[in-house]
Amino acid sequence: LKNFISNSDKLGFVGIFYMLFVYIMFFKDYDYIVNKIHQTTRREIYKSFFIYTIFFIVFPAIFIVLNLLLSFYDSNLFKKILLFLFTWLIFFALFKVSVNKIISTKAAFISSFLTLTTLSITKNLFIYYVVYNKTYTTIYGSLSTLLFSILWIYISWIIYLYGIKICHKLNMKYLNQVV
């Protein structure tokens, strides 16, 4: 992290412009995919930019405060539970706010919990596989780290998008019960 921060001043105008471009394009695509899953229209680009910029600023700030508060506690179990709850809050907020229509709180609550639980279990299984399977490290060397990182990003996004799909199905179910 120190190296990243110390190198950030070397980006220059073009680098900062490129990072901003990638940020906007990522959230534009994310907004398109999430709204397509929920079968609704997309937001205007400036509204999406505003919403995701708030996420990008507020949640890391809350995470820093949470880590500072957790540094005063010795209990690992308490820390793990609190971090799980905080991550659940992030998923809940993303599931609730990302879509350009009203999402049932119950649907977002259940689907975000299922998604986070699946992601946590898969993460532990993936770590176990990477640590104990030495074949890839032997064949590919340090390049295997890059391969596993890309594979993990792919798997985690599949899980996240299926969580969004579960949220859509539950939302349709709960909204039909209200009507």
State each model region's role:
Residues 1-179:
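Membrane-embedded alpha-helices and immediately adjacent juxtamembrane helical segments
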